[in-house]
Amino acid sequence: MIVLQTIAVAFAMFSAVPVPQFGWNEKNMRYALCAFPLVGLLCGVLWCVCGVLPLPAPARAAGFCLVPVWVTGGIHLDGYADTCDALASYGDREKKLDILKDPHCGAFAVIRLCSYFAAYLCLAACVQFTPRVGALWTLALVLERAFSGLAVAAFPMAKNTGLAHTFASAADRTAVRNVLAVLAILLCGALLALGGGALAAVAILLFLWYHHVAVQQLGGITGDLAGWFLQKTELWMLAALCACQWGGLI
């Protein structure tokens, strides 16, 4: 029962999928971050469904672009937009944290979101779907969430409030770090075995860059910054997927 509650908590927080509602408590939040990658698995399965449906090419590309947004409800895009505004302000740490708390969408967020979707749609249109490509992308969507959850359990927090702090405080951080680190290693190995080593390399490099930006710019991570990392990683892994396909590696 606790396992199901843990999964439900993860899906209730990180997706728009209707799930039974449980009150958050010490037991069902302890390993909720370990269930976070399952949201990526669902995104990948639906992405593959979109790939095999007899859709016109533009509709298929739009589906590839929108499936992750529909599944997650845009929660990570919200963090991406807020973080783009904060980092573009070039203010001090407190100024950036204040911008992250501001519910309004600034000019830089709008510009970056439009650019993001234009790039994502263009890359999605370039993907030639095959079962192997579907498997690679599903692994990638799971991997980015494994790294995101690992960061919440391992990186310093920028503040003592917010959802990232709530999940980090409630988690058995040692166990979560170990589980997600092992999962990330296995996923990277699977990507490499399928010819998608470039996707794993991109994810690892962005994970390291994420730590650098978080510590240098904000003194640690926040929920918004976690969303920014996930969306950045997804876009660049999609570019790597296209590059692998163009290069004949997959």
Question: Where are the predicted features?
Answer:
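Multi-pass membrane catalytic core of lipid/isoprenoid biosynthesis enzymes
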Residues: 29-46, 86-132, 136-137, 174-190, ...
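Solvent-exposed interhelical
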Residues: 146-180, 218-222
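Membrane-proximal soluble regions of multi-pass membrane proteins
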Residues: 1-24
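Alpha-helical membrane-inserting segments
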Residues: 46-54, 67, 71, 123-127, ...
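N-terminal beta-alpha supersecondary unit
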Residues: 9-12, 26-51, 165-169
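Membrane-embedded alpha-helical segments that form the functional core of polytopic membrane enzymes
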Residues: 34-84, 135-139, 196-216
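C-terminal ends of transmembrane helices
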Residues: 18-23, 75, 95, 149-159, ...
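Acidic (Asp/Glu-rich) catalytic motifs at the cytosolic membrane interface
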Residues: 67-105, 212-233
